[in-house]
């Protein structure tokens, strides 16, 4: 079983896809890593030798920030924006879109589900 940065790569997938299970590594970066280390992208994770896994692990740890380190770095950047009082930091704190999107309609991904507010009940009709 291939384990890199505390993440078990899925055994039945190709190495090229398996590496994308690491936070911070997408398909392009995965292909780049495999080209640099000389590992065949079509190999299944279960068929990797210990030497290949060690080579991949060493290359990734030396050249990229992934998993916990990357998450911590992102959180620190967001916290820095909030601490210095920027508009972007305020939007992060409020849980609203940060990059200028409209919020009168849409923006539901960032804001979450609608919370319905009970309206006034209609007064009974007079006869």
From Swiss-Prot:
GO terms for biological process: translation. Keywords: Ribonucleoprotein, Ribosomal protein, RNA-binding, rRNA-binding, tRNA-binding. SUPFAM superfamilies: S13-like H2TH domain. Residues 101-127 have a biased composition (Basic residues). It comes from the Bacteria. PROSITE patterns: RIBOSOMAL_S13_1 (PS00646), RIBOSOMAL_S13_2 (PS50159). Pfam families: Ribosomal_S13. The keyword Metal-binding does not apply. Located at the top of the head of the 30S subunit, it contacts several helices of the 16S rRNA. In the 70S ribosome it contacts the 23S rRNA (bridge B1a) and protein L5 of the 50S subunit (bridge B1b), connecting the 2 subunits; these bridges are implicated in subunit movement. Contacts the tRNAs in the A and P-sites. This is Small ribosomal subunit protein uS13. It comes from Crocosphaera subtropica (strain ATCC 51142 / BH68). The lineage of its organism: Bacteria, Bacillati, Cyanobacteriota, Cyanophyceae, Oscillatoriophycideae.
